[in-house]
Amino acid sequence: MPPKKAQTRRIVSLDSLFGHTLLNITGEPVTPTKIAIFQLIRTLFHAHFGVGAVPSLKPFDKDEKTRVFTVLYGLIIMKSEISYDDFRCIVRILNDGLGRSIYYRFVTSMEKLAHGEDQIEMLFEDAFYTAKRPNHEKVLKREDSWLDELTFMNSNSFLYIWIKRVMMQYTRTSQNGTFEIAEKFQKWIISGTLEIISHPILSGINRALPTEIDCSIRARHWCAAQLRLVQLCPTKAMSYFQILDWCDTIHRRHHDVVDVHLLRAAIFVQLKNSSDAVKSLKQFFDMSMLEITENSKHALETLKLMSPSQVALRFGPILQGRVHRIFGERQIASALFAESIQQSQVNVDDMCNRIANMEVTINSIYMSGPLLQRLSGETFAAGKKEEESVENERRVQQNSVHAAVDLNVPTLRSLQKNFREDYELHAFLVSMCKFLLCIQDMMDGKFFKHNSTADYVSVGFHRLRLLLDMNNKGFVLQAFANAIMTSGLIQSGMYHQAKRVAETMIVSNCDAPNSPILETESHAVAGVNLVYSLAAVGDYEKAQKTIDILKNRFPENINWMAARHVDICSKIVNFERNFLLNKYSECSRHLAGLETSAPLEFVLRKSLLLAATGKLAEAVLLLGTYECGDVRGSMRIHMQMATIHTAYGQFETAEIQIQEAGKVAVNAHFLDANLLVVRRVGSLMLGRFMAREAYQVLHALSAKIEHFGSFIEKAIYHVSMARCLRLMHKDPRVHLKQCKAQIIGNKWPAMEKLLLTELTILHHSGGLYPDEQKEMKAKERFGKIEADFPGPCTWMFI
């Protein structure tokens, strides 16, 4: 009997089902939103359990866990993708109830993934599964061991299974697939606009923040960008009140962004709010008193990542002193700079010592009014009340930085984070110190004397040009130097040269994609000096158009530190223009406000106006009582008093004042000083009817008047020469033509009437060249000008 066949039964093959788990499991498609959910779960786990061996200080309680998993389950059951902005709003709402910097940690991890600083890893540490913390020799075990076993998620929960599915799907993804996932994730983060989620509470802490400040990293970049724009191009920055609003939001949401207080201080300075600016600076340095420990061994031994920093004690007084200096509180600023010097010496900080000493020099020479003018006598008198020992100590400290500016590298402590930036800062300080010495010589009237100052400065500028100039320090100093150069050229009567330098600086300041048109104080000074040079050659129309352009570029409510130079320039130029037109009431209007912004210019013009209107005693008293500490200012005051006394026939007193002005001119470097003084000597002699002696004095100035004279000086010179020649019975017509060429276009109608008077006398029947027709034409022209511009010519007062 044949054997029976073995009966086989078809059963399910367990090996075929579970032998290849990665191939047979139903995976969860990996999308950017699910990666973000994975990162959020990891962030929440660290907040509950801790990181590695370091436990969490405040694990989640039952209510907090309920809130956490309500949000997580709501996210994983969503059928569609949501934007990154909406996801951040959800995390912010969760952070509102939980705290523990969940939003900050989540956004930081996401930004690192987006910028490639970290890789996308769909994994958890072992503690996520075991709920047990690893041992570490530096971390003490708790007395109650059960406190170290914090279960975050049940392994049988739907969320746990969902996580496993996502992890499995990502693990079996090919390399090209992971690249595509990373690329989509990066685009998901950086693309799209903010789409407000439908939540009943969208104000306060739950209010959706602008993308620029929705995390600490972006907030720092935004603060740095706005601070740069506020300093270099204020009109391109956001409105100041909007910046303050965003700063308040950053201060509430991102406590680690301490730079926001520095930005607020800069905004308060622009708003002329010195008290709040100082408060913001104090907050900035209070928040920066701690720094990350650089010694990792010390950090592991002490379990402290932060250590106290003494930088604020050294550099805090410098910034606060700058604020006080900007607002004219120079004695307070001087005391703060002295405190910074002491702190730098105690802490052996050579760089801080250099900066503080440089600020002491700037505090003594850099004014809030016109450049290259010394402080008035009243300020000096107040400064002399300080103790003599303090002044001597400060003078020694001042000389120490001047003796040390030739060092090639900083000797002790570095301020910047890398050597290149530190060397750049050092070279900037060296060049700035040399440049300040140059400015001191220019203000003292000895820059063009035979000394080494010019070579000293050129060495500093050459060293600065060798830098990469990462933070535009060299560019800022170069713009400052060009502005000072234009001021120095105008002070020496080199108006055409000043015009070329100012135009070059303005034309080169063009708009670029990464560098907008600069609107610094240096560029405002260059524009103002362009106006002065145009007015000096008689082009008032173009000067006025330039003033209008400057007022639009440097508005008072946005950039008041630059706008003050434009305001001073506008008042001075318009005063001069109206004075030549005999519009004295308009001149009085332009003097309003000039007394505080430019006291020397106010005194000179006020006295000129008083003298022209017959108030001799008041004019002389105003000039005599003003204590001037400026070299060129003293010379101008003596010349002004001399011309006033000459116009009123008080020749002996005028001669004394001319001699005093000559003493200053002889010892000063100003190239036009000799011209200005000697021309007034000629006017004095002409007033005494000493025509031959006046002609000899004035004739020696023929070359200088063409190089260093303004159109007013040239007109007075040529009409004086013409009168001298007429009184000497010689032909004055050449000088009369040259005088007419200077005042053509109704720039000085009163001088034109004086010119017509000379022509009438010259062509009179008893004159040198009798011509009845020319005489009548001169009289008719005189009558027309008198009808339009009545009043005498006050050239003797100038």
From Swiss-Prot:
Organism superkingdom: Eukaryota
Listed GO CC annotations: anaphase-promoting complex
Effect of residue 27 to D: In h1960; results in decreased brood size and a high incidence of males (Him) phenotype
GO biological process, one term: regulation of meiotic cell cycle
Keywords carried by this UniProt record: Cell cycle, Cell division, Coiled coil, Developmental protein, Meiosis, Mitosis, Ubl conjugation pathway
Pathway named in the protein's UniProt entry: Protein modification; protein ubiquitination
Coiled coil: 339-359
Transmembrane residue ranges: none
Phenotype when the gene is knocked out: Double RNAi-mediated knockdown and/or mutagenesis with gfi-3 results in increased embryonic lethality and the production of one-cell arrested embryos.
InterPro entries found in the cross-reference section: Apc5
Organ and tissue specificity: Expressed in head neurons, vulval precursor cells and in mature sperm stored in the spermatheca.
Keyword Cytoplasm assigned: no
Keyword Coiled coil recorded: yes
Family the UniProt entry places it in: Belongs to the APC5 family.
Quaternary structure, from the entry: The APC/C complex is probably composed of at least 12 subunits: apc-2, apc-10, apc-11, cdc-26, emb-1, emb-27, emb-30, mat-1, mat-2, mat-3, such-1 and gfi-3.
Protein task: Probable component of the anaphase promoting complex/cyclosome (APC/C), a cell cycle-regulated E3 ubiquitin ligase that controls progression through mitosis and the G1 phase of the cell cycle. The APC/C complex acts by mediating ubiquitination and subsequent degradation of target proteins. Required for the metaphase to anaphase transition in meiosis. Plays a role in the segregation of DNA and centrioles during meiosis in male germ cells.
Name the record gives this protein: Suppressor of spindle checkpoint defect 1
Species the sequence originates in: Caenorhabditis elegans
High-level lineage: Eukaryota, Metazoa, Ecdysozoa, Nematoda, Chromadorea
